[in-house]
Swiss-Prot record:
GO terms for molecular function: phosphate:acyl-[acyl carrier protein] acyltransferase activity. Its EC number is 2.3.1.274. The keyword Lipid metabolism applies. Homodimer. Probably interacts with PlsY. PANTHER family: FATTY ACID/PHOSPHOLIPID SYNTHESIS PROTEIN PLSX (PTHR30100), PHOSPHATE ACYLTRANSFERASE (PTHR30100:SF1). This is Phosphate acyltransferase.
Amino acid sequence: MISIAIDAMGGDFGPEPIITGVLDALKHRSFNAVLVGDIQKIKPLIPEDYARFVTYIESSEVFSMGESATDALKRKESSIFKAIELVKNGECKAIVSAGHSGATMSLATLRIGRLKNVARPAIATLMPTSLNKKTLVLDVGANVDCKAEHLFQFAIMGESYAKQIMRVKNPKVGLLSNGEEDCKGNEVTKEAFEMMSKLDSFIGNVEGNQIFDGSVDVIICDGFVGNILLKTSEGVASAISKIIKESVKKSPFATVGALLMKRVFKALKIQIDYDEYGGAPLLGVKDCVIISHGKSSPKAVKNAIFQALKFAESDINRVIEDELSHFVR
């Protein structure tokens, strides 16, 4: 049975939503949940029926959101440090954390280590599209400054993820730019374009609107652009939801129409709801690391665990290393 390390203290709302998400996941999948945190707080939240699936690791500290990621290595008693160590030592196959993302990334990179030939790990996230499929975007925050070589490696990692985890047989990989023409972009993306042209999966430059139209399976960008893209998308989705709700309240006819379209709205919510995705994998490290939002609901935690299980059961890291080995200079 696969063991998953879970940072039980990492979220913004304490251990309750995280533990609820773990229990919801255990209703559907068998795995060993290794809960890292204050045992006095988390153990009472576990019903007796689930006790055989849960292991506890005591942690006396919580790495708060306000702390600097550079201090993570010093905080050896923190829940995130101990959870990462469980993966590093081979006691767990994956880690899920809704805590400090910078601390999670730095600890995963320094303690678990990078895959062979990977210069920099990248955070990948799934974006909804109009074709009822997902687009994988990376990097969305791990690296604000990238060289062309880094973007090229992201393309290989993203393509591997699309094949192994998303089950896309022949994924299309695009480079996010300010136009589709080969000449568009800055110096880094132009150089990356030349390097990515070696990949059979590469279709060239893509524009921002193609993230959501389903025409591309994997989109590559640096973490600065990717994080702005991610936060903007979250903001737009939230704003549209609020606009629809306010508009419905203003008219009885709109209210009736909304009731008739309840199923449509529910399907739309599922498409754009972050909770449906759960978390973002950190690609390029030796084991599975899933980074979840600090405000993760139980549903998001459950789906993050499902992501971790799918990753742990796959052969993706071997595939990434094999693909990168073909391009080592």
